[in-house]
Amino acid sequence: MAPAAASGGSTLPSGFSVFTTFPDLLFVCEFVFGGLVWILIASSLVPLPLAQGWVMFVSVFCFVATTSLMILYIIGTHGGETSWITLDAAYHCVAALFYLSASVLEALATISMFDGFTYKHYHENIAAVVFAYVVTLIYVVHAVFSLIRWKSS
């Protein structure tokens, strides 16, 4: 299968085809798992405020930006312009890098919590680390296929 066909073509979908074309259906996974990271970080204790502050910023920023892009694609704001394909690829590359840095920092904060915190708080942070890495992987996959779409446009 050609790269353009594997990535859903060289144009962005509009309407509810956002939920049926790859890689754009990954918006839903980014939304769900990114929201879980946000909730888990917000509900946990903060042993390293600076590190977890960055994780919180990344999760909220990416949640809002992903939701905004998804809504803009559904209502067809892009109008088939190639500049939106560039925006899509750039956003997902930046989001993947941000989430990778946030995942590493959250893992560091969780490791530092091992002694002196309850298991409940420790397990919340472990879940946040796992979901942060899952979201990182989803953003990387979306970025790769967005770059393929960008190159073929």
Swiss-Prot record:
Gene that this sequence comes from: Mal
Stated role: May be involved in vesicular trafficking from the Golgi apparatus to the cell membrane. Plays a role in the maintenance of the myelin sheath, and in axon-glia and glia-glia interactions.
PTM field: Lipoprotein.
Any one Gene Ontology cellular component term annotated for this protein: plasma membrane raft
Stretches assigned to the MARVEL domain: 18-151
Organism (species): Mus musculus (Mouse)
Tissue expression from the record: Expressed in the spinal cord, brain, kidney and gastrointestinal tract especially in the stomach and caecum. Highly expressed by myelinating glial cells.
Subunit structure: Interacts with PLP1.
UniProt membrane topology term: Multi-pass membrane protein
Result of knocking out the encoding gene: Abnormal myelination and optic nerve morphology.
Protein name (Swiss-Prot/TrEMBL): Myelin and lymphocyte protein
Transmembrane parts of this sequence: 25-46, 54-75, 93-114, 126-147
Residues exposed to the Cytoplasmic side: 1-24, 76-92, 148-153
Alphabetized InterPro entries for the sequence: MAL (IPR013295), Marvel (IPR008253), MARVEL-CKLF_proteins (IPR050578)
Family classification: Belongs to the MAL family.
